[in-house]
């Protein structure tokens, strides 16, 4: 079993072979912890789920942190989510004429939530491409995962997540996945459907799950989401219809006080190119800003967690895309897809 040291960030700070502090369990809860530093920014990454544990600037939290040495994250915080984003309604999907069943991990809705990679142990792929040999802090790390084919998802993916911290730009994260093979069906054992004698491309979506936070309650912050449409959901959190945000509680385009408003919805009709979502408030009235260029973003006011922040989840596709096909990515064997998001603080 590998253990990690969690002292002051330094070259190779995950220190394979060192022992973690005694948490009462004798186990390494969230895998290896890697600390990054650049200018006034510092970040911690955990290998479990290629997870962003904390991100700070001058000591101020930009995302909701947690004690990764002793506890599990609440509400998927900071996880890298693939090969689907959000929910598969009913934990089943039809693809290329074949029905697949996936594990339900949200009993209240009956859904398969947030993909397959969020609790897997990703591997550190580089020893320190950024730090100097004199022990300077590292500012970049790459984690890799081999996601093998399974009954519910009979495609194998090679995935990587590159976390890079910059003194001016903050944190940039790029997640790349490549389809490296598909299992052929051998009844009664399921496999990838065949299209014209070849395995169907792998259905794919990707997202992330940081909770933006400020030093004041969420109710006292100003949230800006430049989306013109919102996706309604039913009692099982399955999508029902897309509608304009105009005149609703979900119109955040001009930036407004969160107050008591609750949302756990996907938003779209975002500006072309790179868009920004921001949460402003607290010390110096600064904003934490999430930017990406994907067509969807989920906003969740974390009401079940007593509203410590708002989850902003850029998504390549909407909830239940494995059934609807909307904005679903199809990766042929050998094809890759990359997704990037950035987090920084704005004065």
Regions found by a protein language model. Give the residues of each.
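Short Pro-Gly-centered flexible turn/kink motifs
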Residues: 93-102, 175, 330-346
């Amino acid at each position: 079993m590998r253990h990690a040291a969690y002292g002051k960030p330094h070259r190779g700070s995950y220190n394979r072979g060192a022992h973690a502090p005694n948490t009462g369990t004798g186990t390494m809860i969230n895998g290896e912890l890697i600390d990054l530093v650049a200018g006034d920014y510092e970040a911690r990454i955990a290998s479990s789920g290629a997870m962003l544990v904390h991100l700070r600037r001058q000591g101020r939290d930009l995302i909701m942190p947690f004690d990764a040495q002793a506890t599990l994250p609440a509400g998927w915080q900071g996880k890298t989510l693939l090969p689907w984003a959000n929910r598969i309604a009913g934990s089943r999907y039809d693809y290329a004429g074949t029905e697949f069943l996936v594990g339900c991990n949200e009993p209240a809705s009956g859904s398969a939530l947030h993909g397959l990679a969020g609790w897997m142990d990703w591997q550190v792929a580089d020893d320190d491409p950024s730090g100097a040999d004199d022990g300077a802090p590292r500012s970049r790390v790459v984690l890799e995962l081999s996601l093998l084919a399974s009954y519910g998802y009979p495609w194998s993916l090679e995935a990587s997540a590159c976390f890079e911290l910059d003194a001016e730009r903050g944190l940039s994260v790029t997640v790349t996945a490549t389809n490296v093979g598909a299992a052929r069906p051998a009844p009664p054992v399921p496999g990838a459907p065949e299209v014209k004698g070849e395995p169907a491309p792998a259905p794919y979506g990707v997202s992330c799950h940081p909770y933006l936070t400020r030093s004041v309650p969420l109710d006292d912050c100003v949230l800006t989401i430049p989306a013109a449409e919102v996706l309604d959901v039913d009692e099982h959190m399955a999508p029902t219809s897309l509608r304009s945000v105009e005149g609703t509680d979900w119109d955040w385009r001009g930036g407004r006080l969160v107050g008591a408003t609750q949302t756990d919805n996907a938003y779209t009709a975002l500006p072309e190119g790179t868009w920004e979502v921001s949460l402003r408030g607290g010390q110096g009235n600064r904003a934490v800003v999430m930017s990406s260029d994907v067509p969807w973003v989920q906003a969740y006011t974390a009401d079940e967690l007593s509203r410590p922040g708002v989850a902003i989840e850029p998504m390549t596709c909407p909830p239940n895309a494995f059934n609807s096909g909307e904005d679903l990515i199809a990766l042929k064997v050998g094809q890759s897809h990359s997704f990037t998001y950035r987090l920084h603080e704005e004065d």
